[in-house]
């Protein structure tokens, strides 16, 4: 019984580190406008909800970022909580994102909820939603 608990804890620690790494890779990819990296990180059924109410699919979001229509000059993240439910991980965080998009410059402080799904041994982002915080 004790052995099983220790193995379960180690498994969760590995997944926790993998999710933190996936979050860092996502932030780096959007700042670098790295379409190929986003292609690997984002799930085919991605729902990407912006704080403006606009929703993107995987293809439309990669298109915006790769073309420069959604350009991130900076991204900072403070993770509040991660939670695992089987092969699903939830990440709740505070974000500061700034850059330029089709509406002009943005400098947003946000609450973020991301859902990651583990498939074939790797984590992919399947849902993203932000809400603006009071400045």
Question: Residue spans of the language-model regions?
Answer:
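Short, solvent-exposed loop/turn segments at secondary-structure boundaries
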Residues: 52-53, 102-105
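A mature extracytoplasmic/lumenal domain signature
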Residues: 42, 52, 76, 95-97, ...
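A short gly/proline-enriched turn/hairpin at secondary-structure junctions
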Residues: 30, 41, 45-56, 66-71, ...
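Short, low-complexity N-terminal intrinsically disordered segments enriched in polar/charged residues
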Residues: 2-44, 84
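Surface-exposed, charged secondary-structure patches
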Residues: 62-102
């Amino acid at each position: 019984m004790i052995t099983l608990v220790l193995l379960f804890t180690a498994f969760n620690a590995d997944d926790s580190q993998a999710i933190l790494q996936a979050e860092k890779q996502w932030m780096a990819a959007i700042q670098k406008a790295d379409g190929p990296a986003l292609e690997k990180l984002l799930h085919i059924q991605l729902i990407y909800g912006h704080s403006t109410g606009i929703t993107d699919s995987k293809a439309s979001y990669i298109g915006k970022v790769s073309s420069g229509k959604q350009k991130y000059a900076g991204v900072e993240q403070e993770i509040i909580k991660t939670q695992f439910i089987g092969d699903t991980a939830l990440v709740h965080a505070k974000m500061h994102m700034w850059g330029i998009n089709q509406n002009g410059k943005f400098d947003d402080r946000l609450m973020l909820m991301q859902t990651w799904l583990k498939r074939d041994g790797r984590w992919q982002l399947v849902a993203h939603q932000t809400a603006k915080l009071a400045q």
